[in-house]
Amino acid sequence: MILKLYNTRTRDFSELTNFENVKVYACGPTVYNYAHIGNFRTYVFGDLLIKTLRFLGYKVNYAMNITDIGHLTGDLDDGEDKVAKTAREKGLTVYEISEFFTEAFFNDCRKLNIVYPDKVLVASKHIPIMIEVVKILEEKKITYFSNGNVYFDTSCFKSYGEMAGIDLIDKDMTLPRVDVDKFKRNKTDFVLWFTNSKFKDQEMKWDSPWGFGYPSWHLECAAMNLEYFKDTLDIHLGGVDHIGVHHINEIAIAECFLDNKWCDVFVHGEFLIMDYNKMSKSRGNFITVKDLEDQNFSPLDFRYLCLTSHYRNQLKFSLDNLQASKIARENLINKLSYFYESLDPVDLNTLNKDLKNFGFSVEKEYYDSFVEKISFDLNVAQGLALLWEIIKSENLSFVSKLRLAFIFDEIMSLNLREEILKNLQNHDVVIDENMKALIEERRIAKCEKNFKRADEIRDFFAKKGFVLVDTKEGTKVKRG
C-alpha cells in the first residue's frame, strides 16, 4: 500500500509512489547536552516513519546529522556556539563534549527502540562540501560579505519562506528565532559562514576563502544533504520549530545551489508540552531518559505514551500521563502473556514461522485495517487502539491475537515478544484443571514412591515446554 503523508511544504497530503530508493533525512541533535524527551518525541515519530516505510515494502536510505559544531543561541552573528559554550563551562574540548553527548544520544535511542540511521553525518567531518556550496552561491551572486561573515541574500530566492508563510515584502514582521542584525541587508538574510563571532576562543575553525571560521547550522544540513543524497531528497523530517527558520533556510541554500527543486516532502512533528510550554533546554523544563529511569519508568513507557497521540498533535506530558501509559503497557504484556502461556506446542511453533500466513479471514481483516491506518499519515495511535480491540475480541483465538500483536510490533517496537518471555520467566504459569489433576497425581505418586509415574508426568509437562518446580508451597509450573 502507498504511504500518504501530510506535507508541510504543500499544506496537503502527498503520496509516496517511489518504492525503490526513498531518501530520508532527519535533523539530528546538537550534541552539547543530553537530549530530552521532547526531542525524543520527534525521534520516535521519525522512527515510526522509517519502520512504516520498510513495513510497506519501501527501500529506504535514512540519514541523520550530528551537529557537533553547534549552532548559535540566536541568529545574530555575535551569538555563542552551544557546543563551545558547554566545553568552556566543563573545562573540556569541544571534541570531547560532542563525542560524549553523541554516544549518550544513541544510547537513549537504543533504549527507546529508535532505529539507527543508515548514515550518520557528523558536521565537522564535512567542511569541504560546506565551503564548496558557499563558493558556488557566491559565484551566483546570492551571497554578500558583511562584518566578517558571509550572508545568504534571501531577496535572490523569490520563493523564500513559502513553506512557513513568510512574506518578504512585509519588512516589519517578527520572525521566530531570528534576531535583529544591523549587518543584514534584509531581515530574513542569514549567515552561511562565520569568521567573526563573540566567542573568540572557539576550537572548531577551518580555513576558507573568507578567513578562518565555521559554518552555520543551516549550511551544515543543506550541504551534507547535497553531498550524500546528491540532487534530490524525498522526505525531510524535523520538529515544527524547524519550519520557520531552519528548514526554509535549507531549502533556499539547496535550491539556489541546484537551480532546481530539492526536497518534495517535509514532515514535522508537534511539541511535547509540559506545563503548557514546549519542553526545551533553554527554558530549563526538560526531562531526560535517565530521569525517567530514576523514577522507575521504562523508556518504553514513554514510547507507549508517544504512540497514543498522532505526531501532528501536541502531546501533553505529565507523570500521571506517563504512569497511565506504564500501566497500559504492563496490562498489554500481561494479557498477551496469558495468551502465550495457554498455547500448545503446535501454536507456539506457528508463531515462530511466517507471521503473515493468516489462517482466518478475520485475522486478515484486522491486518488490512492496521495497514490502512498507518498508511494514512502514520496513524499509529489508531493502530494501537486497534490492537486493544483485538485483545478484547471474542472472534479471535489466542494465537491469532498474538500473531497480530507481533506484526503490529514491527512498527510499534514495544518489544512485545521479549517482554512476554521475560514476564513468563518471572511468573508461575496459569494452569487448567487437567494440569492441576496431573500435578496432584504426581504428588501422590511421589508420596507412594511411584517415581516412574512421577517422572512420566514430569516428562509430559516438559514436552509441552513446562518445568515443574517443587516448593514448600507446592508444585509451581514455569516455562522451560
Swiss-Prot record:
Residue interval(s) of motif 'KMSKS' region: 278-282
Motif ('HIGH' region): 29-39
List of residues binding ATP: K281
EC number per UniProt: 6.1.1.16
Subcellular location: Cytoplasm
Signal peptide residue numbers: none
Cofactor: Zn(2+)
GO cellular component, one term: cytosol
Protein's GO biological process: cysteinyl-tRNA aminoacylation
Binding residues annotated for Zn(2+), in chain numbering: C27, C221, H246, E250
Record note on cofactor: Binds 1 zinc ion per subunit.
UniProt family annotation: Belongs to the class-I aminoacyl-tRNA synthetase family.
Official protein name in the record: Cysteine--tRNA ligase
Taxonomic source organism: Borreliella burgdorferi (strain ZS7) (Borrelia burgdorferi)
